[in-house]
């Protein structure tokens, strides 16, 4: 087994893949200009106690978070200044989850005054490097390599391209709700605000001669490692329901031990809670960071995709001056990003011209010559 961390850099974004030989075992997206905040240390101020929710709302620098009583809100009153750390990223209309259980060093950093960000938490690359301490890190941006070398040292190697075409295609496939499996079977993955539903489709595999029930059981058992891998790679979290293919509800419970084993390598320790009366496997996986499907949508994600394409075009034609014509929502999402546009300007030797076009869809964009 040879583990390797590959980090492909583009303006404002780093896509990070952990490889075990040729197998993708972990994936994360790091956006330094818009982090999810997990691990950040803040000086906050309690704004309201909410007994019905067993906690308190805390004003942070630019946001509000929720501090449960069990994490330090018990006994505190509105106006209290305290140190807190983000333990779970914001979700939908809910702010980040907090804890006030700090060590002595962190507590000494808090001081007094209005809410302020005291220290950034580790980014995805640092977290994955810590999770796989023996894995070398291959990175394709000299500027980021210089920043990370003091912490990663000899583990870090600068390469021309961290992702080859095959790995890029595998990463792109994580955005597809349909996962094709060997033998014609497939997974259909559909996140909703309440849960993620995963349907196993046997396809043509049950046409194999033999006892149909035995074939279907073997099929479902065989896809469990791939099911667990997709859950981890896509960072699916919260409630996950799996509808296995072609098995009576009472037979599906026999898949429980093998499914538990398949989930065991996931560092977030997802748990199989059991099977519903309809035979759906109930899995719960802690939500700490936003799932991949949330990171890939919206104006900011569209803008970073445009900058990635612009950087690729400029690498082929260094003298080309480009403009980004995009929906106003994309321009508005990119402008406050303190990293992305400056990163592209560093690569290109000039700033990207931004043109808001209200006629375009909210996530639509076009790269065009800067001089029209």
Predicted features by range, described:
Residues 1-36, 40-43, 47, 81, ...:
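Extended, charged alpha/beta regions that create polyanion-binding interfaces
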Residues 51, 63-65, 146, 328-330, ...:
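Extended acidic low-complexity intrinsically disordered segments
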Residues 17-18, 56-61, 66-68, 85, ...:
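Short, acidic/hydrophobic/Gly-rich beta-strand patch recurrent on exposed beta strands
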Residues 28-33, 57, 63-75:
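Beta-strand/loop nucleic-acid-binding surfaces
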Residues 10, 50-51, 77-78, 127-134, ...:
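Flexible, charged surface loops at secondary-structure boundaries
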Residues 3, 54-58, 90-100, 106, ...:
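Conserved glycine-centered short motifs in functionally critical loops
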Residues 65-78, 89, 93, 244-245:
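Alpha-helical multi-pass transmembrane bundles of energy-transducing inner-membrane proteins
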Residues 61-62, 151-152, 348:
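Short, structured coil segments at secondary-structure junctions
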């Amino acid at each position: 087994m040879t583990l390797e961390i590959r980090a492909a850099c583009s303006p404002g974004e780093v896509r990070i893949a952990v490889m075990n030989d040729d197998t993708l075992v972990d994936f994360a997206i790091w956006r330094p200009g818009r982090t999810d905040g997990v691990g950040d240390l803040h000086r906050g101020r309690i704004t309201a106690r909410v007994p019905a929710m067993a906690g308190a709302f805390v004003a942070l620098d630019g946001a509000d978070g929720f501090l449960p009583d069990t994490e330090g809100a018990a006994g505190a009153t509105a106006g209290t200044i305290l140190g807190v750390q983000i333990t779970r990223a914001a979700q939908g209309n809910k702010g980040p989850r907090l804890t006030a259980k700090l060590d002595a060093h962190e507590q000494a950093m808090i001081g007094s005054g209005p809410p302020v960000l005291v220290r950034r938490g580790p980014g995805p690359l640092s977290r994955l490097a810590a999770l796989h301490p023996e894995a070398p890190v291959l990175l394709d941006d000299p500027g980021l390599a210089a920043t990370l070398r003091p912490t990663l040292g000899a583990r870090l190697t600068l390469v021309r391209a961290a992702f080859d075409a095959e790995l890029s295609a595998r990463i792109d496939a994580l955005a597809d709700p349909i996962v094709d499996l060997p033998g014609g079977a497939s997974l259909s993955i559909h996140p909703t605000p309440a849960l993620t539903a995963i349907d196993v489709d046997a396809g043509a595999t049950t046409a194999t001669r033999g006892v149909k029930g035995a074939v279907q059981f073997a099929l479902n058992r065989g896809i469990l490692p791939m099911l667990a891998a997709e859950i981890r790679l896509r960072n699916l979290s919260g409630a996950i329901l799996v509808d296995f293919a072609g098995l009576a509800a009472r037979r599906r419970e026999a898949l429980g031990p093998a499914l538990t084993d398949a989930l065991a390598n996931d560092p977030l320790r997802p748990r199989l809670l059991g099977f519903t009366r309809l035979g759906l496997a109930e899995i719960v996986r802690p939500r700490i960071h936003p799932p991949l499907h949330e990171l890939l949508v919206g104006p900011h994600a569209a803008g970073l995709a445009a900058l990635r394409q612009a950087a690729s075009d400029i690498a082929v034609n260094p003298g080309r001056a480009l403009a980004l014509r995009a929906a106003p929502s994309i321009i508005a999402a990119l402008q406050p990003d303190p990293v992305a546009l400056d990163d592209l300007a560093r690569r290109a030797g000039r700033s990207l011209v931004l043109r808001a076009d209200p006629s375009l869809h909210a996530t639509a964009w076009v790269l065009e010559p800067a001089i029209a």
